[in-house]
A protein has these predicted regions:
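Membrane-cytosol interface segments of multi-pass membrane proteins
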Residues: 1-191, 316-359
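Alpha-helical transmembrane segments and terminal signal-anchor/GPI-anchor hydrophobic tails
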Residues: 17, 22, 209-212, 219-294, ...
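Aromatic-anchored segments of alpha-helical transmembrane domains
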Residues: 40-47, 189-202, 239-252, 298-305
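Interfacial loop-to-helix transition and helix-capping segments at the boundaries
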Residues: 62-74, 150-164, 195-213, 247-272, ...
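Specific transmembrane alpha-helix
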Residues: 74-87, 166-176, 194, 199-228, ...
Length: 359
C-alpha cells in the first residue's frame, strides 16, 4: 500500500515537473515571437530614418506609422532582458554570468561593429579613393560612451542596446540587492520610475527602471507570469499584436496628452505584459530564434544600399511609405539567406556572430 502511494506521489510529481517544463517552453517560445515582432518594428523605424537621410523628410502617412511601431520596442527588450537575467540569477556565480554575457553580447557587439566599419571604409575607398575614417575615428566608431561632453555612438547604431544592457549586467549584484526584497524592491522601482524620464534616451539611467521591473518579476513572480501566459483561453498572439499595431497608429494623437508622454514606460510595461498574458501560445515553434538577433545586428549594414536601390527603382512612382515597407521586407529576406547560409556552411562563424545562442 505504501509503495503504491509513493508510486502515485512520484507520478504526480513527475507530471507536475513535465507540466512546468512545458509551460516554460511555451512561454519562452511566445517571447521569441514577440521579440522578433519588435525587432521588425526597429528595422522599420531605421528604414524610415535612413530614407529621410537620402531623400529628405517623408510626408507619407505610412512612414509615420512605421516610425510609431517602434515606440515601445526598447522597453520590451530591456524588460525581458531583466526578467531572464534574474529568473536564473542564482543559477550562476557573478563571474560565470559575466563570462557568458561577454560571449553572447560583447563579442557580437565588436564583430558586427567591425564588419560594418569594414564595409563603410571599403565603399568610401571605391567611391572617393580614400577611407572615410582615420584609425582613431575607426576606434571611436566602435565605442558607445556618454560621459559629460564625451559622446560616441556606435557606427552601427542599433548596437548601442547591446552595450547598454551589458552595463546593467555588470552592476547586476547591486540591482539584485535593490529588488530582492519585495517591499524594498517595490519602493526602489517607484523611485526609478520617477527618475527615469529625466535621463537622456541612451543614458544609463533611462532604461534602468524597465530593466529592474523585468528583474523584479523574474525574481518574485516568475511562476505567476508563466502560468498567466499559459492560460488555455485567450485571443491569438497575432491578434494581440494587431491590437498593438492599432494603438501605435493612434500614438500621435495619444502622445498629445502630457500624462502619456510622462508615463511612457508604465504604458509600455502594461502593453508588453498585456501581449504576453492575453495572447495564446503560438502553435508554431520558433526554431530560428537567432535570426531575430542577426536581423537586429545586421539591418543597418544593409539599409543604406537597399534604400538607394529601392529609391532609384520605385521612388518616382510609388508612395515613399510603400517603398520603405519594401525595403524592410527585402532586408529581412537577405538577412534570412545570410543566416541560413552561415548556419549550414559556416557554423563556427554563425555561432560567434549569434553570440553562441541556440536556435
Amino acid at each position: 500500500m505504501q509503495i503504491e502511494i509513493n508510486r502515485i506521489e512520484y507520478e504526480e510529481m513527475e507530471t507536475r515537473e513535465t507540466m512546468d517544463f512545458d509551460a516554460f517552453k511555451n512561454f519562452s517560445n511566445k517571447i521569441k515571437w514577440i521579440n522578433l515582432f519588435f525587432i521588425i518594428t526597429v528595422v522599420a523605424m531605421h528604414c524610415v530614418r535612413e530614407w529621410e537621410t537620402y531623400y529628405g523628410r517623408s510626408d507619407s502617412a505610412i512612414s509615420s506609422f512605421l516610425i510609431n511601431l517602434e515606440v515601445y520596442a526598447m522597453a520590451c527588450f530591456f524588460m525581458m532582458s531583466g526578467f531572464w537575467l534574474f529568473y536564473e540569477y542564482e543559477k550562476y556565480t557573478y563571474f560565470e554570468m559575466i563570462r557568458k554575457k561577454i560571449y553572447s553580447i560583447f563579442v557580437p557587439y565588436i564583430l558586427w561593429g567591425v564588419l560594418n566599419l569594414i564595409i563603410v571604409q571599403a565603399v568610401s575607398l571605391v567611391e572617393t579613393g580614400q577611407m572615410k575614417y582615420s584609425a582613431l575615428d575607426s576606434i571611436k566608431s566602435l565605442l558607445f560612451i556618454q560621459i559629460g561632453t564625451i559622446n560616441f555612438q556606435p557606427l552601427n547604431d542599433p548596437l548601442w542596446y547591446l552595450i547598454r544592457i551589458m552595463t546593467y549586467f555588470i552592476v547586476a549584484p547591486v540591482l539584485y540587492y535593490l529588488i530582492k526584497n519585495k517591499v524594498v524592491g517595490a519602493i526602489s522601482l517607484l523611485v526609478l520610475a520617477m527618475a527615469s524620464s529625466s535621463f537622456g534616451y541612451y543614458s544609463f539611467g533611462r532604461w534602468l527602471f524597465v530593466f529592474c521591473f523585468g528583474g523584479y518579476i523574474g525574481l518574485h513572480y516568475k511562476e505567476n507570469i508563466i502560468k498567466a501566459a499559459n492560460r488555455p483561453r485567450g485571443i491569438s498572439l497575432a491578434f494581440t499584436l494587431l491590437i498593438y499595431i492599432a494603438l501605435c497608429a493612434l500614438y500621435p494623437y495619444l502622445n498629445a496628452h502630457e500624462m502619456i508622454k510622462k508615463d511612457i514606460d508604465i504604458i509600455a510595461i502594461i502593453i508588453v505584459l498585456g501581449i504576453i498574458i492575453l495572447g495564446k501560445n503560438p502553435s508554431i515553434e520558433m526554431k530560428h530564434s537567432n535570426y531575430a538577433f542577426m536581423l537586429y545586428c545586421a539591418h543597418m549594414i544593409l539599409m543604406p544600399f537597399l534604400v538607394k536601390i529601392v529609391g532609384l527603382i520605385l521612388g518616382n512612382w510609388v508612395d515613399e511609405g510603400v517603398c520603405q515597407g519594401i525595403v524592410v521586407l527585402v532586408c529581412g529576406f537577405i538577412v534570412a539567406i545570410i543566416y541560413l547560409v552561415l548556419k549550414k556552411f559556416a557554423p563556427g562563424v554563425y555561432r560567434v556572430l549569434a553570440g553562441g545562442r541556440n536556435g
